[in-house]
Regions:
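Short, well-ordered amphipathic alpha-helical segments that serve as non-catalytic structural scaffolds
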Residues: 1-3
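C-terminal structured subdomain/cap of oxidoreductase catalytic cores
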Residues: 167, 171-178
Length: 178
């Protein structure tokens, strides 16, 4: 409370402060809920890889209490986004997997990253939580999410615009994508 009050009440701080709260993965099984999403920590389903990013900045955000449920924005997008947002130079020879999306972070845009996001499950987690044969690899590209084993077996494809809970595998209907 005191820190947020200080920021709200100081015009210079209010105009130039952005507080971010985020997590690196979904909840541990039994320690929380992934809401409508399938899976838990160590799973490559959305319940394991999706987590909230809370941004607070009374002088920077387009709207207060705004929830963006549609943009694809990854933790790897934070560094280039924050560098651009603050007008800081990018380090020489720095290559980022992330994309700069300051408008999305500030709630002024619903833009999503353009490049795919790749995921790999650690090899020692094949039967974590007693679940067998969890997918080893995943890629999120636009509205599509593809999961499979290391050898490409057991493909799963989900349309994330219509099936956020990853309940309907449409891989057989979209061989051209698989």
């Amino acid at each position: 409370g005191k820190l947020f009050d200080l920021i709200r009440n100081d015009p210079a701080l209010r105009a130039n402060t952005l507080v971010l709260v985020c997590s690196d993965n979904g909840p541990e099984r039994g320690a929380g809920s992934a809401g409508p999403f399938r899976g838990f920590k160590t799973h490559l389903y959305e319940g394991g890889v999706r987590s909230s990013l809370i941004a607070w900045g009374p002088g920077l955000l387009a709207k207060q209490n705004h929830v963006n449920r549609t943009s694809v924005f990854s933790a790897i997008d934070l560094v280039p986004t924050l560098l651009d947002l603050t007008g800081s130079p990018h380090p020489k020879n720095a290559n980022y997997d992330g994309e700069s999306l300051p408008g999305t972070l500030l709630g002024k845009s619903a833009a999503s990253r353009k490049a795919p996001i790749y995921f790999r499950r650690p090899p020692d987690r094949d039967s974590f939580y007693g679940d067998k044969d969890l997918p080893d690899l995943a890629v999120r590209d636009g509205k599509w999410k593809f999961l499979c084993e290391y050898d490409g077996a057991e493909p799963e494809l989900f349309d994330m615009e219509t099936d956020r809970g990853e309940t309907k595998n449409v891989a057989t209907q979209h061989n051209e994508l698989v």
